[in-house]
Amino acid sequence: MAQTNSFFMLISSLMFLSLSQGQESQTELPNPRISCPEGTNAYRSYCYYFNEDPETWVDADLYCQNMNSGNLVSVLTQAEGAFVASLIKESSTDDSNVWIGLHDPKKNRRWHWSSGSLVSYKSWDTGSPSSANAGYCASLTSCSGFKKWKDESCEKKFSFVCKFKN
């Protein structure tokens, strides 16, 4: 009888131990807080930088590539678009357009993000992109609160937003 009780206690202890260890491994660890360089802003796992110095689309993207290997911002969701719009508005800029990383490199109306991200979310302004317009680079427009995209000539000079991993 003593062996049966000892065996029962041993099995019970092992079951309790395995249950408590299972609970420990299922506990979610908090996401580490992203740290971005001074003068930039964090959103999710990226850092963002708004530059008010006007550049052509190509020069703006090169600037972003030289800044922590980033690109002009790719706006992949509505929530990210709202974040970028708030970042621009907080700067109190007078600019009517701000470059983003969307462009049509082959001029065939097939738009791509300079970062290589897939274009799944779209936020074109009414009438954009327009085949009547010779614009193959996209900007955010102030008249939409910087939430809508418009195709523009890549040679125009606008301020811009960079996006990069730190």
Swiss-Prot record:
All O-linked glycans consist of Gal-GlcNAc-Gal-GalNAc tetrasaccharide core and get elongated (microheterogeneity). Glycans are attached at T27. It comes from Homo sapiens (Human). It is found in: Secreted. Coiled coil: none annotated. Might act as an inhibitor of spontaneous calcium carbonate precipitation. May be associated with neuronal sprouting in brain, and with brain and pancreas regeneration. Its main location: secreted. This is Lithostathine-1-beta. GO terms for biological process: antimicrobial humoral immune response mediated by antimicrobial peptide; positive regulation of cell population proliferation; response to peptide hormone. It comes from the Eukaryota. GO terms for cellular component: extracellular exosome; extracellular space. InterPro entries: C-type_lectin-like, C-type_lectin-like/link_sf, C-type_lectin/snaclec_domain, C-type_lectin_CS, CTDL_fold. Keywords: Disulfide bond, Glycoprotein, Lectin, Secreted, Signal. Residues 34-164 form the C-type lectin domain. GO terms for molecular function: oligosaccharide binding; peptidoglycan binding; signaling receptor activity. PANTHER family: MANNOSE, PHOSPHOLIPASE, LECTIN RECEPTOR RELATED. Residues 1-22 form the signal peptide. Disulfide bonds join C36-C47, C64-C162, C137-C154. The keyword Cell membrane does not apply.
